[in-house]
Amino acid sequence: MKRFIKSIGIIAAILVILVIFYLFMPRVEGPAVSGNNGNALQEGDIAPDFTATKVDGSTFKLSDHSDECVLINFWATWCGPCVGEMPAFQKLNDDDIDGLEIICIDCQEDEKTVDSFVKENGYTFNIAYDTKGEICAKYPTRGIPYTLVVNKGKIVNIYVGAVDADTQYKEYKSAIDACLGE
């Protein structure tokens, strides 16, 4: 009988560990970022237009920047790789590159969470809300961070995932330089 109770205890402990692991496992996919993979965007496609409200209260409309190079990033505060590459966007913003617009769109989080994150980190580049996932739905992907470089309305580079801020900065800067013909 003691052996049976001990076995039940071990099984219960394993189940608890599995449940805890599942609950706290980072989620890179979710309703905000997943979509019909048959509709995934590709380099050369026209970037779907969108209008987003930025954390400063102003709006960003992609089609208003059709003559510029636009770096669009989809991210969330709970996504470790997303948070890890944010310094790359700040550095690009600080470089003050003529002809470049940066817009980072938070996927389906409440505005207070995003505002708090931006304030805590002192980010000054364009960050926008997509609380209902409407913009993210236009840009289906398997995961975030998901970054696109758009030149004159056309997608020229797509990045899914991140390595570290320095590596991402170099990759994005190279793509932006090519986009701007530098």
Language-model features, listed with the residues they occupy:
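A short beta-strand-turn-helix
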Residues: 49-70
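Conserved hydrophobic/aromatic "anchor" residues
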Residues: 50, 60, 74-75, 117, ...
